């Protein structure tokens, strides 16, 4: 018998990569998992090399980044690979989650799989925010100031919590050191949850475009789906290296190339593009505390998704109304991202508020109602 089946360590990898039985009708929408795995490995590797040259001191942080760019061999490549890799990482996460929502991958028996994915998403946002602050450019400083100030919205303990995070009365040297420590640690926590995510996936197998149990029609992972994953990985790497070679600052903010100055406020404080939808939700509510809660619940509401979908059919492949509703949700999410980058003025304030209302209505009102309506139509069709 082959060593890949007899060796206790290799056989474990074999059961995931080689002989894993997968539904034969899986499309390219199921390739985002492998792309995310590649992104995670690249972020870990580039991050470790960057940490060797980074100095987590408020006065030296920006200088150390410029030192990497100009005096470290291929330091510019490492930095741009890491910063642009984060952008691709989030793009694939959003597409991965959109596919899961469309095809009902959050429903039983894959609820644990979905919940661990949402946990990873929450940790990713925390990690990305702290990493962005470590550059300590102008936008990094003010982004850290604005976002950490949101903690003060907490009743009674808010100011004390903010000062605990800052290590002083404002963003200062202890803040950068704490962010660096956590930014280095959290990716390994994400990698650990990713392993649990794979275990949960392996216990019930992958979903498929039809949303049906496909135990009678499966094929091994190798060579069919492994080759399909390889195609998209090479396509991604081509776009990725093209971007970091020719347009490395395209996804960033030029103002972050200026050293952080607490005495000069930028014209507009805007986070990275992958955090803009939730930033728009934060700004849509005038109350500071309610805005913070809305932004937090915009992520946590994904945990309740398995409980608000009452449809008897998994996925939207055969549900016309759900397809239309999901299309509106995707357009609304993109609109939130665009509004998050705009100045706080009319008509962007009103559009942001309407988009925020629709975002929460999709999960709490529209999805349950549409699923109940489609169940009724389904039963009526059976009786005929």
UniProtKB/Swiss-Prot annotation:
What the entry lists under InterPro entries is as follows: Cyt_b/b6_C (IPR005798), Cyt_b/b6_C_sf (IPR036150), Cyt_b/b6_N (IPR005797), Cytb/b6-like_sf (IPR027387), Cytochrome_b (IPR030689), Cytochrome_b_C_euk/bac (IPR048260), Cytochrome_b_N_euk/bac (IPR048259), Di-haem_cyt_TM (IPR016174)
* One GO CC term, this protein: mitochondrial inner membrane
GO biological process assignments: mitochondrial electron transport, ubiquinol to cytochrome c
Instruction: Classify the main location.
Output: mitochondrion
Q: Which amino acids does the record list as binding heme b b562?
A: 82, 183
Q: Can you name one GO molecular function term for this protein?
A: metal ion binding
Note describing how the cofactor binds: Binds 2 heme b groups non-covalently.
Cofactor needs: heme b
Q: How does it assemble?
A: Fungal cytochrome b-c1 complex contains 10 subunits; 3 respiratory subunits, 2 core proteins and 5 low-molecular weight proteins. Cytochrome b-c1 complex is a homodimer.
Question: What is the name attached to this protein's record?
Answer: Cytochrome b
Its lineage opens with: Eukaryota, Fungi, Dikarya, Ascomycota, Saccharomycotina
What gene is this protein a product of?
COB
